[in-house]
């Protein structure tokens, strides 16, 4: 994951390719391990490991909460927050009872977060770096882990997005199409 912000006051000559267009970088990575029930399509996130660059962290507990929150929100988009539409294009999931979001039951059994304090040589608040938005990308690791688990069983499987139990079962059914 690589995240950057452009500051308008920076000097960069596009035609000459000289200068620095960006001074604010955030690096990170994530891994997820999942388990799939081949009969129901349900999945469980067993382990998640996240490494995120924080610069000079202003509050490690708040930063950890922001990283976890962004991860869970993104994981929801990738695994359960489906937006079905009818033939007229109207959304069918418009209430809390029809739009599924992650619950406590969906949380990873084990989540480890390592925050790397890298310092910051450029202007930011006390040398801190972005914590709220960049970790959002880490939730994709759950979708890729589910896809890889399915492909270990059905190599030609195609998993749609989000990876709902129905989507997982449909991907597992591809094996029958190729028999």
Regions found by a protein language model. Give the residues of each.
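C-terminal catalytic domains of large/alpha subunits in multi-subunit enzymes
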Residues: 1-179
